[in-house]
Amino acid sequence: MGTRDYENFKREVNSGKRVTYIKLRDFQILENDSYPRREFREPRNVTINNDNTISFDVENWTTFKSQTVTVNVSEIDSFSF
C-alpha cells in the first residue's frame, strides 16, 4: 500500500468506517490454522498501530475462533470499505 492509500485508509478507519475486505500481497498462515490466506472478508476490530502495522480480527478456519492478525502496511495489496 502506498503512502497516499495508507493515509486514506487511516482516515477512513479512524472516522469509524467499516473495512469489508483486506487483500495481502502474499499468503499468510495463521497460527493453528491449516489454510493459507491472503484475502480477508469482513475483518473485525481493524486497528491502525503506531509502528506502521494494522491489526484486525478474523475467524480461524480450523478452530472457528476469532484470531488477531497483525501485518505491516507494506503487505497490504488492496482493501474495501
What are these regions (language model features)?
Residues 27-33, 61-69:
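Short, surface-exposed beta-strand/loop "edge" segments at domain boundaries and coil↔beta transitions
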Residues 46, 61, 68-81:
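Structured surface patches comprising rigid loops and adjacent beta-strands/short helices at the edges
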